[in-house]
Design a protein with these regions (language model features):
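C-terminal motif of bacterial Sec signal peptides marking the signal peptidase cleavage site
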Residues: 12-14
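Sec-dependent signal peptide recognition
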Residues: 1-7
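Extended amphipathic alpha-helical interaction segments
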Residues: 132-284
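N-terminal Sec/ER secretory leader and immediately downstream segment
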Residues: 19-166
């Protein structure tokens, strides 16, 4: 029965590692170092989930266009009447922000076509010119509603799990979506040729299911915490590490083996993957921070990445200092 009990205990203890293989790498690294130093490992809870401000704090309502003077033959001919009537229908009123953004670009193109290609009365031209100006002014608001309040993007920006190496095939698509949104924000006013010819809805499904940005953010925080607690474990016990001529260097050799077999082979490649993924999403991170700031809010992923780089460098510097003290050739020491 005792054997069965301890086997079950080991099984339960290992479940967390199985469900979080990325976290398990850092746990194993930390545990092995603690074992070699003959000290208890530090306890570390899972990092807090990544969240964003409530939708009500970020959403901006825009007035609907009234048909009014648009009920003319010319405006029916140029397609504007039918486009707005469809938007004001029951189905059009419940469009999500991605579909609404497609509608806004179609509306701008249609308004431009009506103004440049069809004979209009003075009242019609005055009305359409005013609407055209308003819709260009409102475009950043519609973009903000996509980026910050759509269910798709709110899922993309939040997470409570580590970034998996299996996410590699999602990176290019998510990066492309952020690039397209950024290009829309930078579209000069009234430069119709700079509006996208594609539908933004095509990006929606992949963005919604991947949570890539949120997972990168969560992993940056989690990695920083694990590196910090592990560096402190090493620093606070470095007097235990004996090396030099005519000294028993068994413990140092064991530490070096842990460094080579776990840090170099497992931890460092994962850190590089996380950093590379963030770099590919950097334009999106900057865009999110900028737009959040305009609403008096903050996301925080850029600061999380800075902290991640700082904690990585601190950990590397400990090993470099230890190897120098113990006479290990610098070429064999870790690099940031």
């Amino acid at each position: 029965m005792k054997i069965l009990f301890f086997a079950l205990l080991a099984l339960l203890s290992g479940c967390n590692g199985w469900t979080n293989p990325e976290r398990a790498i850092f746990e194993k690294y930390h545990q092995r170092l603690a074992n070699v130093l003959d000290v208890p490992p530090r306890e570390l809870d899972e990092a807090s989930a990544i969240t964003i401000p409530d939708k009500r704090a970020l959403y901006q309502e825009q007035p609907r266009l009234s048909l009014g003077l648009l009920e003319s033959y010319q405006l029916r001919q140029c397609g504007l009447f039918n486009l707005i009537a469809e938007k004001n229908s029951q189905l059009g009123k419940v469009q999500d922000p991605f579909h609404d953004l497609d509608y806004q670009t179609t509306l701008l193109n249609t308004l431009n076509g009506c103004l440049t290609e069809y004979p209009l009365s003075e009242d019609e031209r005055t009305t359409l010119t005013r609407l055209y100006e308003q819709k260009w002014q409102h475009l950043p608001v519609h973009l903000d509603n996509v980026l910050l309040t759509s269910e798709t993007m709110r899922k993309q920006l939040t997470a409570s799990s580590w970034l998996s190496a299996k996410s590699r095939n999602q990176i290019a698509h998510i990066s492309k979506t952020f690039h397209a949104l950024n290009a829309m924000y930078e579209t000069p006013k009234r430069v119709i040729s700079r509006l996208p010819s594609f539908s933004f809805v095509q990006y929606q499904e992949e963005m919604e299911k991947s949570r890539l940005m949120g997972k990168v953010y969560f992993t940056l925080n989690s990695t920083s915490e694990w590196l910090d607690v592990t560096t402190k474990l090493l620093e606070e016990n470095q007097e235990r590490i004996v090396c030099g001529k005519n000294r028993d260097t068994t413990q140092f050799r064991y530490l070096k083996n842990v460094f080579q077999s776990i840090y170099v082979e497992e931890v460092q490649p994962y850190i590089a993957f996380v950093d590379s993924t963030y770099q590919q999403l950097n334009d999106g991170a900057i865009l999110i921070e900028q737009r959040m700031e305009l609403h008096g809010e903050s996301y925080g992923v850029i600061k999380a990445h800075e902290q991640f780089r700082t904690k990585t460098l601190e950990h590397v510097k400990f090993w470099q200092g230890l190897f120098k003290r113990c006479g290990v050739v610098v070429g064999n020491s870790p690099t940031p």
